[in-house]
Amino acid sequence: MGRRCCVANCPSTSRLLEHNGVTYHSFPLDPIIRAIWIKNSRISLERQITKSVLVCSRHFRRLDFNTIRNGKYLLKPRVFPTVFPWGKMDTAEIEADQRALQHASVEGTTETPGNAQSSTNDDVIKATVDQIVAQILSESAERKATEEGKTGKAADDVKNTPESGEDANKAAAKEPSGTPVAASSEATVPAPGSASSSNSPLPGTPPKYSNPHNLTIGARLEALSVEGNWLPARIVEVNETEQTLLVRFERNHKLKVSPSTSGSFQEWMAIKSERLRQRLSNRVLPVFELDEKCMARWSGPRKFPGTIRKLLGNDTYEVLFDDGYVKNVRAVHMNKMPKQLPPVQVAEEGASKSPTPVGTPVSSAPVAPKRASTGSLGGSSGSSGSKKSKCAPQRRDWPLLDMASLDIASLGLPEIPHDGEWTCHWVNDQPIGTEGFLIVGEHQKPTVIVQDWRLPPGWIKHMYQRSNVLGKWDVILVSPSGKRFRSKSDLKLFLESQNLVYNPDVYDFSIHRRRAKDINAYVYTHGYNPQPPPKPRPMDVSMNSTLDQSITSQHSLPSTPMPVKESQYMEAPVASLMPPAELMSPQTQPADETKPKIEAEILEASEGGTSQLMLADPHVVENGFAFIGGLKVKIQDNLYVCPREDCAKTYRKEDFLLIHIRHYHKEFAEHVSHCPKMQELAVKRTHPSSIDQVEAVPKNQIPNQQFFAKMHQQDLQQSRSFKRQSVSATATSSTPSDITPTKALLSPKMEPPSVSPTVESGIKQEDVSLDAGPTQSFNPSLSRSCKRARLSPSKRPSGSRKSNRQRSQRRPILSDNPAGHGLTEQDVEETRQSFNTPTPDTRIDSKKRRSGAATTPISSIDSPAMGDSVSTPSSNDQTDINAALAPPPAETLSKAPQYIKENGELIRIVRMRQEEIINCICEYGEEDGLMIQCELCLCWQHGACNGIVKEADVPDKYVCYICRNPQRGRDSMRFKHDQDWLFEGKLPVAAYHTANPQATKQFELLKRSHTLTGNLLDAKRSMHSLLVKINIARNRCHPKLYLWAKKWDEDNLDSTALTPVKRAKLEAPDLPNVPQPEAAIDPEECQYRLIEHIKVQQSLVLDRLNDIEAEMDELEKEDTLDDLKDADISTTKEALATFIKELETMKRLAKLNQVANMKQTLRDSATSK
C-alpha cells in the first residue's frame, strides 16, 4: 500500500510515477509542534493522528530541509508546513508561530524542572494536548465566522485573522508552560537509572539532560556504552520511519577497549532509548538578520566584527568579516554588536586623563600605566621606610578578577561535565574559582582554588600565575596534611611512600585550556583586551652596555619615594624615540658628544616628578590603545588600527601592521625600531632543523622544595632591584666623560638571569673601582675577545664538533692597562664559576695532513716539551678569561706555514675549513694524522682507518666505503660512480704489471670510440624524432600541426645571427593597449612548413652520419693491432672460456661464504642475548 499526503486537495501519492522524489513525513511527537501542524494543515480534530498520517514535502519550504552527503534532503526539527493548495501562509503568521514555539521551549526548559521527562509522562502530554486542541477549536470557529461574512468588511476581517491567530498562539504557548509545572510537582521521583536523577541529586535543581531533542546530523549527544560509561557521540544518520539513530562514538585516547561489544564505534539506537541523552542548555541563542553587524568567533575565543551574508539555517550563518574573509559560524560562537558608550563617559574620561592623539609618537617621558589591583593600596608616597613592617597589607602580584563583582550568570557559561576530560571556567585568561593563597617566604601568593571532582577528599587544587612569565599558569596540589606538590615526580614518590598508587588522570597538573575552549567555557568580557605574549628583547652587544643600563635605571628610578606595593611590581614602560643601543656605534656618535645629552636627560628625568621612561614591553594596553615602538596605536574590536588618520586600516597582528607602515607610511617607520619582513615571518613559521634545535630541558626538572625556595628568591631579588639601580646610577654619575666602562668580564651573549645576585653585586663594585682609575686605553686583543661568542660544552648544539681549530691556549694579559690589575683572583674565580667557563682542551695532535693542527712553528718541531709548556699555564699567572677562550691572533698564524717532521721528512700542515665534515668508519669526528677526502660525498676520513698510511699511497680517485656500499642500493646503480673507462677511456691496471708505454694511446683511442658511440646514439634519437614528425606531416588533421604555424629554422637563424643593439627607449603613445586577435592557422601552411623543417633536419642528420663515418675510418687507420679475421685464435678462445668458468666458480664460493657469515652473525647475536 502506498503513502499519501493527508492535506486536502493534495495529489501527492507514492503509487504514481509523476510524484517520484516527493518525501512523506509523519507528525512530530512534541505536542506543541504537532498542534501547529494540525492547525496549519486544517485537519479535522476528530481524526486520530497515527504514523500512517503523513504530510508530503511539497508543503514545506526549501529552508526547512538539511542537505546530507548523498544528496538527499532531511527535514529539520521543530519546523511546520506553510505551503498549501489554498495558498502560502502569511509571513507574519509564520513568524508568530516561530516566536510562540521558541517562547514555549524556553519557558519549558527554565520553569518546569520535569519537562525533560515529558515524553514519558502521559498526564503532562494529555493536559498539554487538551489545551492546544481547545485553542484550535476556538480558532476554527473564528475562521468559519470570517468565511460566512461576504460583506464589504471582508478585507478588515482578513487583516484581523493573523492577529487573532498570533494571540491564540501566544496563549497556547503560555498555558502549556504552566500546566506541566503542576503536573510535574505531583509526579513521583523518576527512576534512578534516568539521566536527570544521576546528575541532579537535589530535587529543586533543573535537569541537566533529556532525551535527544536535536536530531540533526552531526549533533552532539552522549550514549551509554556496554561498560556503563557515558561517552560523547555524534549523530550520523536519522531513520524517521523506524525512529532510530545511527550514533558514532568519538574516539578517546583514554579508552582501553572498544565502547561496543561488536568492536565498532557506530551503533543504531532508538530515539527514546534510555542509553541516549542530550544536555539541556539554558542559553538562548541570538537571532540575526541579513546584513546585520555582529561579533563572530575566529579560530580561538576572540571575536571579530563581521556582517551576516546568508541565513544557512540550523543556527548557522555565513559571516563576512571586515577583512574580507567569509566563514560559516554557528550562533553559539556569535554575539550581538556591543553598544557604543554614551558620549558623557567619554567626556568624563577625557577630562580625567587626556590620551595622546592616535599616530603621534610617544614622548620621551610618558607616565607609566599601572596594573589595577584588587588589594588596597597601603601607605603614601613617603611610606617607603615602613617596607618591612608587619602591619602593611599583603601585596598581590597579579590583578586577579574580583569574584564578588563578577556576574557569572550573564556570561552564559555552560556547566562543566563530570565525565571525560577535566577543565574549569575561564574568564579573561583567568580560571574561575575560590580565592585562595599560599604562603611563600614572607608574603602570601594569591591563587585560585578550582574544583576537581577526580581528587580524593581533602586534596585541594591551586592555580597561580607566575610573576616572571606573563600569562603562564601553574597548578599546585595540596594534600590533606598541607604538603604542596607541583610536579608528578614528587607526588609519585610521596604516594609510593604512603603505599598508594599514582594515577595521572586523578592527580592532574595540566590546566586544560583547549578543553575549556572546545566546550565554550573560555570567554572574554567586552572591556577586556587579551595581552599578547612578550617578545624577547634584542641583546645589547655594544661597548657602552653598562652606561646604557645605568641611564635606563636612572630614568626608571622615581624622584619621589613610592609605596612598596607600586614600586616593586609596576609595569615596565614603553621605549622612547631614542634609537636602540645596538645602533649607537662609537664611529657614528662618540662618547664625548653623547655624554652631555645623557646627563641632561637624567637631570630632566629627576626633575620630572613621577614621570618615567617606558622601556620594555611594547604591548602595554591603556584605554583601548597599545604602544608599538614609539607609536600609540588604537585597538578597535581586537584589531590594530593604522595610526595614519586618513588610512584607518585594521590588522589582526602587530607584524602585519608594521609591514604596512614600512611600505605605505614611511614617515612613521622611523618611530619603530624594527619592521619585520615577509621572509623573516616565513622563517619563523618553518620548523627548525635538527642541527638548530637544542636538547629540550624537562619541565619538572626543579625539585619541589627548591621550587618554592626559588620563588622566594625571585621576590627578594625584585624587592632589591632599586638598590642595585641606585648603585649603578651613582657609579655612572662619577664616571669621567672620556671613559666608557664596560663589563669586561661578561660575555655579550650571556643572559642576565644566569648571574647570581652576589656575583652581580661584585661586578658592580668592580665597575666602580675601574671608573675611579685614570683614563685607560683598550687593548685591541682584549676588545676583540670581549665581542667573541662562547658556548658552554653542555649547551653546544647538535651537529657541531669540537676540534683543534676551535681550541686555543690560555695566554697571559699582554695589555698595559694599569686598571686591569685591580681584579683579584677571588673575583676572577667567582666570575669563572658563575658563567660555567669551559676548560680548554690541551691535547695537541702530532700528525696532520689536511686538518687544523696545533700551531707549532718549524723551529720548535724537535722540542716535545714545547706543547706542554704552552698548553699548561702556571696557576700564578694573571690570566684573562675571555683571552683564554679566544683564538690566537691572525698575525701569528699567517707568519709562516706550519710543518711536522715524520720519518725525517717535513710535511706541511693544511688547515681544514669550518664547513668541511669528518665522516669516517671509525665514528671519530676529530682530525688525526693523514686525512683523505671522498670524491662523491666530499667527507674527510682518516687514512689509517682505510689502510692508507703514506701520502704516496693515496689513489687518484678515492671513493669511501660508505659510498661504495650504500644502504638499500640498487644493483644496477652499484658501479655508477666508477665510469672512468666510459668517459676517460681508462681501464683498471694491476699494480704488479709493468708500465705499458702504449697505454696512454690506447686509452685515447678507447675514449674516442666511446665518443663516437655516443654520437651514434644521439643520431638514433634524432632519427626517431624525424619519424614522428613525418607521421604528423602525413596526417592533415593532426592536432599538433599548429606547432609549425611559424618557421622553426628561420627563427633559430635570426636569433643566432642578430646581435643586440642598444637603442633609446621610445615613449609609448597614450593609446589604449588592446590585445590584437591572432591570425587564423591554416593547416596546409603548417603542413608545408613541417615538410621543409623535416628536409632541413634530415640533411643535418646525414651530414652528422658522414662525419661519424669519416672519424671511424681515421680510427681504423690508427689501430696498430693485427687483423684477426684469418688468424687462428682457438687457443685464445679456450683460455677465455677457462677464465670465465673460474670466475663463475669464484662467484659461487663468494655466495656460500656470505651465507655462512650471515648464519654465524645470527648465531652470535642469539647467544649474546
Swiss-Prot record:
PANTHER family for the chain: MBD-R2, PHD FINGER PROTEIN 20-RELATED
Segments of skewed composition (Polar residues): 107-122, 353-363, 542-559, 774-784, 853-862, 869-881
Gene name linked to the record: MBD-R2
Low complexity composition bias: residue spans: 190-202, 726-742
CDD domains documented for this protein: MBT_PHF20L1-like, MeCP2_MBD, Tudor_PHF20-like
The UniProt record lists the keyword Zinc: yes
Gene Ontology MF annotations: DNA binding; promoter-specific chromatin binding; zinc ion binding
Short name of any one Pfam family annotated for the protein: PHD_5
Basic residues bias: start-end ranges: 798-810
InterPro entries the record matches: DNA-bd_dom_sf, Methyl_CpG_DNA-bd, PHF20-like, THAP_Znf, THAP_Znf_sf, Tudor, Zinc_finger_PHD-type_CS, Znf_C2H2_type
Name recorded for this polypeptide: Protein MBD-R2
Zinc finger (C2H2-type): 640-665
Keyword DNA-binding: yes
GO BP annotations, alphabetical order: chromatin organization; positive regulation of transcription by RNA polymerase II; regulation of transcription by RNA polymerase II
SUPFAM superfamilies: DNA-binding domain (SSF54171), FYVE/PHD zinc finger (SSF57903), Glucocorticoid receptor-like (DNA-binding domain) (SSF57716), Tudor/PWWP/MBT (SSF63748)
Zinc finger extent (THAP-type): 5-59
Quaternary structure (record): Component of the non-specific lethal (NLS) histone acetyltransferase complex at least composed of mof, nls1, dgt1/NSL2, Rcd1/NSL3, Rcd5/MCRS2, MBD-R2 and wds.
GO cellular component: chromatin; euchromatin; NSL complex; nucleus; polytene chromosome; polytene chromosome interband
Cellular compartment(s): Nucleus; Chromosome
Function: Component of the non-specific lethal (NLS) complex, a multiprotein complex that promotes expression of housekeeping genes on X chromosome and autosomes.
Keyword entries, A-Z: Chromatin regulator, Chromosome, DNA-binding, Metal-binding, Nucleus, Repeat, Zinc, Zinc-finger
